[in-house]
Structures are given as structure tokens and as C-alpha cells.
UniProtKB/Swiss-Prot annotation:
Keyword Transmembrane assigned: yes
Name of the protein in its database record: Na(+)/H(+) antiporter subunit D1
An annotated GO cellular component: plasma membrane
Quaternary context: May form a heterooligomeric complex that consists of seven subunits: mnhA1, mnhB1, mnhC1, mnhD1, mnhE1, mnhF1 and mnhG1.
Bilayer topology annotation: Multi-pass membrane protein
Record gene name: mnhD1
Family as reported in the entry's similarity comment: Belongs to the CPA3 antiporters (TC 2.A.63) subunit D family.
Record-level GO BP terms: ATP synthesis coupled electron transport; sodium ion transport
Amino acid sequence: MIESNLLVLTLVIPILTAILLIFIGKRPIIKRHVALVGTLLTLVIALINLKNVLRDGPIKVELGSWKAPYSIVFVVDIFSALLIITSIIITILVILYSYRSIGLDRERHYYYFSIMFMLIGIIGSFTTGDIFNLFVFFEVFLMSSYCLLVIGTTKIQLQETIKYILVNVVSSSFFVMGVAVLYSVVGTLNLAHISERLSQLSVHDSGLVNIVFILFIFVFATKAGVFPMYVWLPGAYYAPPVAIITFFGALLTKVGVYAIARTLSLFFNNTVSFSHYVILFLALLTIIFGCIGAIAYYDTKKIILYNIMIAVGVILVGIAMMNESGMTGAIYYTLHDMLVKASLFLLIGVMYKITKTTDLRHFGGLIKGYPILGWTFFIAALSLAGIPPFSGFYGKFYIVRATFEKGFYLSGIIVLLSSLIVLYSVIRIFLKGFFGEVEGYTLSKKVNVKYLTTIAVASTVITVIFGLSADTLFPIIKDGAETFVDPSQYIHSVLGGK
């Protein structure tokens, strides 16, 4: 009972914090502290939830007097618990970074309120136990992201927000259609119950299940930034300030990735024969087009944005394998990418603060005045590229091993080659931005970026610690992967009256 209450608190605390932020009015200093304290409290509860999951297995809470599958159910397993903790840590870093970067005008209005509601949507997506509430929480974080995108009302923000809204309105419409078709087939919305019902379906209904799979893949691939539905991502994520880009780039695409992993495991693993091949094909194309984008641009933000696509593709390769090695690598690499992308965006934000540009052709030589910033970026770049002993190596190792275990050798080779492209793209930023010389550009009077650099360094230190803790984390992550490869434990925890 206590464990169930704690699970709900990860949603209740951000909701209460958001409500309190409304009543505070236009007092940014107080808003900062309220948002930070609320997020820290949520982190404490999330850590306790992880401890309970490791001890007891997946935990659930049923709202109302009904039992599953008829009640509204929230479930936390190892993967969702780790995702929640990582999301909250990144939210804390973004809030702290925003103190000196986002501007008082944005802080006075609904900036922190939107961040809290976006966190609610993300946590809800990771914990909901039914497919319709997954749609609801998707809409919660999407509505919040619309607000964050438009705060500041610059021309580029308004342009990209309109595109972003249109894409997501279409995507959400297809989501509702998919839920409706699925309900017409199985007569339930509970994820675990849907899994049971789908396993009992006759061949006559397989065509409808295939339609549901196609609809869901379109929706979740759009959220995750998968080829060819990624076209909205580079523009929408480029437009807002760096603190908001960090929040979006590190977290939002991972909700789509999680939804693909969960529905493939529970719904389509054994009912749609071509599901793995579709996901693998899209994953490889995402990696390839992400690599092209990463080396085509000189803009530091664009380079890292296209690296998001590469990472999503790599994770989906592991998910498509749906074996222990693949899911272990996918889970670890997802957490790694969330942390390292946050670090890189925060570091690029500091570089922009100094140079007032993100174009590598217009600045250089930063290492002379900002050596800590430069070498921190170098460490984050090595981690992103998967150079051992940093965290990117371990996840990719397991994913590549999974492809070889399944006989998908070309897929494994593409993942390995993508590491070289990633390394080239980020080392190019390091060499040109910190050691390069641009004609006509001289480093101006030193800008005070100590506070922002401290937050960015702290984020990178967390990433390094995550990599160095791989031996401790992998037994936990392997247990989390088993829940996806064999979802019976998840199903039993929801429907078995635990």
C-alpha cells in the first residue's frame, strides 16, 4: 500500500508544484525555488520507487475501487523507474541552468509551470498501465511543449511551433484511431490485458492487428523522430533557447522510444510477424539520415540535433532484436543518451553565450579563455561517440552483439560505422570551436559564464559516473530487459492481484 502511494506521489508532487506556481504570480525568484524543491522531492520519491521495484518487482497502483483491468492502473518496472529518475535529474539541471540563461521575462510567466506539466506528462507516459491514458499523457507533455516552444515569441519560434503543432495534431489523431481499432478487437484498454487478449485472437482478426501496428508505429515514430517522420525535429528543437532545447532533446524523443518498446513487447512481438523488420528498417534509415545531417551542417545545435536521430536509430535496432542483449543495450543506451545529450546542449549553450553564434565558421579559439569548457566538451563528445570507458560504449556493445546473435550482421556494422560519424561530427565542433582560427574573429572580452559552465560540467560528471558505474548497473538493467523479452512478469504484476 505504501509503495503504491509513493508511485502516485511522483505525479502528485509535480501537479501540486505546478498549481502553486500559478498562484505565486510574476515573482521569478520564488518560482525558481518552488520548481527546484518540487522536482527534488519528486526525485527522492522516484529513488524510493526504484528501490521497491528492485526488491519486489514491478509495482502498481489501482485508482478507484475497481481492480485491473477495469481500473486506471499505474505501473513501474525497472526500465520506467530508471527513465523517471533520469528525466527528473535532467529537469533539475535544466531548472538550475535556466536561472542565468532563460531570461526574467520568460520566468515571470509560465516557464516553470510548463516545465512541471511537461514532467508530469513524461512521468505519466512511463507509468501508465493503459493505452488510452498513454494518449492522455502524450497530450499533456505536448501541450506543455507548445507553451515552451512559443515562450519568447520570436519569429522562428512561432514558425516552428505552427509546424510542430500540425505534425502532432495529425499524429494524435492517428493515435486515437489506433486505440479505437484496438479496442474494437480486444475490448479492453489495459496494456497487460490487451497482451493477453491478443495472444488469444484468431487468424481472422490478424489484419486489424496489423493495422493497429502500422498506426501505432506511425504515431510513436513521429514522437521519437524516426525516419521519415523526423522532418519536424531539427526545426522545432532548434528554435527555442538552449535550456528548452536540452529538455526537449534529452527527454521527448525517449517517450516515443519507450512506447515502441512497450507496445512491441506486449502487443506485437508474437502477433505481427513483420513488426521487428519494420522497426529495424526504420531504425537503420534513421541512423543513415541522422549521420548525413550530422556531417552536413556547421551549426553546433543542428549537429547535436541530428545526433539525436542517430541515437534513436541505434536504440531501435536493439529494441527490434527483442532479445536479452538487444534490450539490455537499448535500455542502457537510452539512459546514456538522455544524460549525454543534456550535457552537450548545456555546453553548447555556454559556447553560444560567449560567441553569440552557433555557426562553427564564425568563431574559434575558445580553449584559450575557457579551457574547462573545452575539455569538458571533449569528454562529453567521447561519451557520445561510445569511446570506452565512457557510457556510450557499453550500450552499443550489447546492441551490436544482439544483431550478431540474431544474424543481422549488416545492421551491426551500420551501428558501428555510425559511431565513427558521431565521433567525427562532435570532434569537429571541438577542434574548430576551441582550437580553430577564423579570419576576422578574435575572442572578445572574457564573458562571465562560471555558473552556466558549472551546471554543464556537473551534467557531464553525472554522465561519466554513469559510464564508470556500468558493472553495478548492468545486473539491474538486465533484469529490466527481461521484463520486455518475457512480459509475463509485467502482466502478472498488473492482473495477478499482486
